[in-house]
Swiss-Prot record:
<dbReference type="GO" id="GO:0004375">
    <property type="term" value="F:glycine dehydrogenase (decarboxylating) activity"/>
</dbReference>
<dbReference type="InterPro" id="IPR015422">
    <property type="entry name" value="PyrdxlP-dep_Trfase_small"/>
</dbReference>
<dbReference type="GO" id="GO:0009941">
    <property type="term" value="C:chloroplast envelope"/>
</dbReference>
<dbReference type="InterPro" id="IPR003437">
    <property type="entry name" value="GcvP"/>
</dbReference>
<comment type="similarity">
    <text>Belongs to the GcvP family.</text>
</comment>
<dbReference type="GO" id="GO:0005960">
    <property type="term" value="C:glycine cleavage complex"/>
</dbReference>
<dbReference type="GO" id="GO:0019464">
    <property type="term" value="P:glycine decarboxylation via glycine cleavage system"/>
</dbReference>
<keyword id="KW-0560">Oxidoreductase</keyword>
<feature type="modified residue" description="N6-(pyridoxal phosphate)lysine">
    <location>
        <position position="770"/>
    </location>
</feature>
<dbReference type="Pfam" id="PF02347">
    <property type="entry name" value="GDC-P"/>
</dbReference>
<protein>
    <recommendedName>
        <fullName>Glycine dehydrogenase (decarboxylating) B, mitochondrial</fullName>
        <ecNumber>1.4.4.2</ecNumber>
    </recommendedName>
</protein>
<dbReference type="InterPro" id="IPR049315">
    <property type="entry name" value="GDC-P_N"/>
</dbReference>
<dbReference type="InterPro" id="IPR015424">
    <property type="entry name" value="PyrdxlP-dep_Trfase"/>
</dbReference>
<dbReference type="InterPro" id="IPR049316">
    <property type="entry name" value="GDC-P_C"/>
</dbReference>
<comment type="function">
    <text>The glycine cleavage system catalyzes the degradation of glycine. The P protein binds the alpha-amino group of glycine through its pyridoxal phosphate cofactor; CO(2) is released and the remaining methylamine moiety is then transferred to the lipoamide cofactor of the H protein.</text>
</comment>
<keyword id="KW-0496">Mitochondrion</keyword>
<dbReference type="InterPro" id="IPR015421">
    <property type="entry name" value="PyrdxlP-dep_Trfase_major"/>
</dbReference>
Length: 1034
């Protein structure tokens, strides 16, 4: 009866709505964001005769469309900004009748796809369906207690850090701190990280993170080669290093023509005079703790540099490598409060002496002063970096793992020196108790060498012991058939030790407990290796030890930084799009976060299923046949892709093919990546429209026909245009024996419209942190998986501990080596891209590309009467980004891109990419996630700034002392007792009306980069020193 009554009411309401326009809702059948995202047929129900006896009215009713009954939490309408009405209006403003006509005019017909269809999730999952699917995958992962070690450890992630940094969009949606005045918070945190690393390693210089420990070791190897000016071509690695580190170094050495020798320490031989450096592990991969003092003295006596891979937690109680004499120290900060995540992301580090500071890879944060003379932070020595020095750069690494470095730094701040020492001593005590108990049992033999946290055990059958541990949901490391290691960590309990006694008892009764024998256990660290030097003495590491205090410190730093929480970040070639909450949620679920990368794959079936699905989806999107998920950054993907090409040529006997052609319009990291692969780089130019000069390219390819290895091309180009001749370009390279490497930096303008494989590329890396929604994290993490055509699939990277390869797997495999420390790179953040692709569906993700192009063209049209737009396609349109030419303004008004970017801060915006790829310009990329209102607000800001520049040009304001040159204007400057500027405080602070409702304030005046590089300080200084420097520069 109740159901019948409700149906009657529903029928009456529908009938009344139809026959009484005054009560009908005009929005019901309008193509709004809500309705149109469900189905275009929601409002097209057919009229039928109603049952007169049902409701007493002789009226007609409309049926309810089945589409209207589908779930309402669809995702594309939440991600893509423009409604259908807005799309049409914006397209008309640009000069086209609709969005599709704009796309037809922009993307060359010769490479246009008819359509794209997923084999799975084609219609897109709703947000609730996606969460349910991820929960199902998570349930297929088994969380065992890990005692594997090898550089990865369970850790107790402080929840205050988890919630307020890792799960906080105010931290994870920031970009690399290029605009220092609105990035002082994370710059301070990264300076804390560098200080923590330098204190613990005993060396004065550290970078602000690298990708992982293995690649950090490879970077250190490259440094040794550079320090020796390439004259010594052998690098020796101790056999006590982690196997993944050894393999990464071997792979990397090929590009530098270095010979890598793996040897026991006692067998190191420098007699050839050809050794540039050595790598040792401290403590060793199997736990042994050695005093390297004499070893290092001997190496130095032979002109050999020493790299030491170390453990940060161990260094809180061990003599620091710097005091032992090490030249370079590398390692991972993972166990400082960052989950294992099946391999990453984690912040690695590299520390060295002041002597080698300009040879260091990665970002470095330094102390400087602002225009008022007050201390301020910024990225130091940027002239070392790949987008500036290109093939002469120290490394191809861009941003690395800033978000994870910030987590590790906060872990150090939260615990402080005493807290960290307590954790280290507890871990060491648990390992010592375990070793003592095994000796008591007598069923196995324990290594005699001292150890920190890892105990090496010799037994009759290591597999049998590991299987017994498996029954207790514990994973041990099997070294060989007679050797096992057991690594302890912060999460290990005394009860775990008792369980391990039962495992190793092999059926023998255990007559004691860990608690009962613990008082008898002696410290296993030799007196000569006990740390005596204090560390983390700065007040920052000694004042935030309660949750309230740390919460406020984190919040204080966050408040200094502009993120996507505040406004769009229109950095060209960076794709700062929405990082949706549903995409981010699975990242911190224990079922994904707490798995060791070397755990048996049957314990990670949820991950494995996701990898397979993601590989298939990426193949569909790119037109490739197989993918490797191992490269854990865009730069790593570039390197991996080129190494695949190199391996392909080598396998065919074409060892001489080493020439790489790179257009000037290619992505900035390309030359550095090619140089790392040992390639000879030939640059080709562009024409007046920004397109690759095809005839120049043809001549270069034909002239190097016998040695041509690859072309590196970015598409659309970094000039913001779809080049009409891209298919011809690919054919030229193939006809001359080369392979085409496509940089995936601009994939956001390809998805669903064309694809690298369709265009003719052989290999391409994808920036999952751009096109596929992994957040930039203030400078990392990222992922750079590579897709390849079938003929290159056998050469995709593998791993020495857990063999991997292409997804789908090729019929045969000849892997090039190992690219990253973990088998599947930074696996923990892959769910972000996976959920984005699955929720968008093929149509939604195609529309994302279209709207990104629409937004860029809309902005270019709004700005074209105020600034020259440098390059356009054949039909007058741009791709998903465009370049604004400011070069004339330097002559007419003394204004440069930096000035405009700093004034944009006063308007509440992060500046676009400055002076790249063309000096004196700004490159703008809005992405599909920004609303028309936000696009207009940014355009209004740039137009307003152009009017301010016009006042300079007219002579109405001073050429050097004006509101643009004085920008940005922080509160302390505006509230100063004296105001000497020739413009008002009000105009400096509120140049646009919307700022009065809400404004993001910079926290410092314009930072002096030159002063900072001339007076290089890259660690926290005592507070009084900051005050003295400020007074000296005032």
């Amino acid at each position: 009866m109740e159901r019948a009554r409700r149906l009657a009411i529903l029928g009456r309401l529908v009938s009344q709505t139809k026959h009484n326009p005054s009560i009908s809702s005009p929005a019901l059948c309008s193509p709004s964001r809500y309705v149109s995202s469900l189905s275009p047929y929601v409002c097209s129900g057919t009229n039928v005769r109603s049952d007169r006896n049902l409701n007493g009215f002789g009226s007609q009713v409309r049926t309810i469309s089945v589409e209207a009954l589908k779930p309402s939490d669809t995702f594309p309408r939440r991600h893509n900004s423009a409604t259908p009405e807005e799309q049409t209006k914006m397209a008309e403003f640009v000069g086209f009748p609709n969005l599709d006509s704009l796309i037809d005019a922009t993307v060359p017909k010769s490479i246009r796809l008819d359509s794209m269809k997923y084999s799975k999730f084609d219609e897109g999952l709703t947000e609730s369906q996606m969460i349910a699917h991820m929960q199902d995958l998570a349930s297929k992962n088994k969380i065992f207690k890990s005692f594997i070690g090898m550089g990865y450890y369970n850790t107790s992630v402080p929840t205050v850090i988890l919630r307020n940094i890792m799960e906080n969009p105010g931290w994870y949606t920031q970009y690399t701190p290029y605009q220092a005045e609105i990035a002082q918070g994370r710059l301070e945190s990264l300076l804390n990280f560098q200080t923590m690393i330098t204190d613990l390693t005993g060396l004065p210089m550290s970078n602000a993170s690298l990708l992982d420990e293995g690649t950090a070791a490879a970077e250190a190897m490259a440094m040794c080669n550079n320090i020796q000016k390439g004259k010594k071509k052998t690098f020796i690695i101790a056999s006590n290093c982690h196997p993944q580190t050894i393999d990464i170094c071997k792979t990397r050495a090929d590009g530098f023509d270095l010979k890598v020798v793996t040897s026991d320490l006692k067998d190191f031989d420098y007699s050839s005079g050809d050794v540039c450096g050595v790598l040792v592990q401290y403590p060793g991969t199997e736990g042994e703790l050695l005093d390297y003092s004499e070893f290092i003295k001997n190496a130095h006596a032979n002109g050999v540099k020493v790299v030491m891979a170390s453990d940060l937690l161990a260094l809180t109680i061990l003599k620091p490598p710097g005091e032992l004499g090490a030249d370079i120290v590398v390692g991972s900060a993972q166990r400082f409060g960052v989950p294992m995540g099946y391999g990453g992301p984690h912040a690695a580090f590299l520390a060295t002496s002041q002597e080698y500071k300009r040879m260091m890879p990665g970002r470095i944060i330094g102390v400087s002063v602002d225009s008022s003379g007050k201390p301020a932070l910024r990225m130091a020595m940027q002239t070392r970096e790949q987008h500036i020095r290109r093939d002469k750069a120290t490394s191809n690494i861009c941003t690395a793992q800033a978000l994870l470095a910030n987590m590790a730094a906060m872990f150090g701040v939260y615990h402080g020196p005493e807290g960290l020492k307590t954790i280290a001593k507890r871990v060491h005590g648990l390992a010592g108790t375990f070793a003592s108990g095994l000796k008591k049992l007598g069923t196995v033999q324990v290594q005699d060498l001292p150890f920190f946290d890892t105990v090496k055990v010799t037994c009759a059958d290591s597999k049998a012991i590991a299987e017994e541990a498996y029954k207790h949901k514990m994973n041990l490391r099997i070294v060989d058939k007679n050797t096992i290691t057991v690594a302890f960590d912060e999460t290990t309990t005394i009860e775990d030790v008792d369980t391990l006694f039962k495992v190793f008892a092999l059926g023998k009764p255990v007559t004691f407990t860990a608690a009962s024998i613990a008082p008898e256990v002696q410290d296993a660290i030799p007196s000569g290796l006990v740390r005596e030097t204090p560390y983390l003495t700065h007040p920052i590491f000694n004042m935030y030890h309660t949750e309230h205090e740390l919460l406020r410190y984190i919040s204080k730093l966050q408040s200094k930084d502009l993120s996507l929480c505040h406004s769009m970040i229109p950095l060209g070639s960076c794709t700062m799009k929405l990082n949706a909450t549903t995409e981010m949620m699975p990242v911190t679920w224990p079922a994904f976060a707490d798995i060791h990368p070397f755990a048996p794959t049957e314990q990670a079936q949820g991950y494995q299923e996701m990898f397979k699905n993601l590989g298939d989806l990426l193949c569909t999107i790119t037109g490739f046949d197989s993918f490797s998920l191992q490269p854990n950054a865009g730069a790593a993907g570039e390197y991996a892709g080129l190494m695949v090409i190199r391996a392909y040529h080598m396998a065919r006997g074409d060892h001489h093919r080493n020439v790489c052609i790179i257009p000037v319009s290619a992505h900035g990291t390309n030359p550095a990546s090619a140089a790392m692969c040992g390639m000879k780089i030939i640059t080709v130019g562009t024409d007046s429209k920004g397109n690759i000069n095809i005839e120049e390219l043809r001549k270069a390819a034909e002239a190097n026909k016998e040695n041509l290895s690859a072309l590196m091309v970015t598409y659309p180009s970094t000039h913001g245009v779809y080049e009409e001749g891209i298919d011809e370009i690919c054919k030229i390279i193939h006809d001359n024996g080369g392979q085409v490497y496509m940089d995936g930096a601009n994939m956001n303008a390809q998805v669903g419209l064309t694809s690298p494989g369709w265009i003719g590329a052989d290999v391409c890396h994808l920036n999952l942190h751009k096109t596929f929604c992994i957040p930039h994290g203030g400078g990392g993490p990222g992922m750079g998986p590579i897709g390849v055509k079938k003929h290159l699939a056998p050469y995709l990277p593998s791993h020495p501990v857990v063999p991997t390869g292409g997804i789908p797997a090729p019929e045969q495999s000849q892997p090039l080596g190992t690219i990253a420390a973990a088998p599947w790179g930074s696996a923990l953040i892959l769910p972000i891209s996976y959920t984005y692709i699955a929720m968008m569906g093929s149509q939604g993700i195609t529309n994302a590309s279209k709207i990104a192009i629409l937004n860029a063209n809309y902005m270019a049209k709004r700005l074209e009467n105020h600034y020259p737009i440098l390059f356009r396609g054949v039909n007058g349109t741009v791709a998903h980004e465009f370049i604004v030419d400011l070069r004339p303004l330097k002559t007419t008004a003394g204004i440069e891109p930096e000035d405009v970017a700093k004034r944009l801060i006063d308007y509440g915006f992060h500046g676009p990419t400055m002076s790249w790829p063309v000096p004196g310009t700004l490159m703008i990329e809005p992405t599909e996630s920004e609303s028309k209102a936000e696009l207009d607000r940014f355009c209004d800001a740039l137009i307003s700034i152009r009017q301010e520049i016009a006042e300079i040009e007219k002579g109405n304001v001073d050429f050097n002392n004006n509101v643009i040159k004085g920008a940005p204007h922080p509160p302390q400057l505006l509230m100063a007792d004296k105001w000497t500027k020739p413009y008002s405080r009000e105009y400096a602070a509120y140049p646009a009306p919307w700022l009065r409702a809400a404004k993001f304030w910079p926290t410092t005046c314009r930072v002096d980069n030159v002063y900072g590089d001339r007076n290089l300080i890259c660690t926290l200084q005592p507070p009084q020193e900051y005050e003295e420097k400020a007074e000296a520069t005032a």
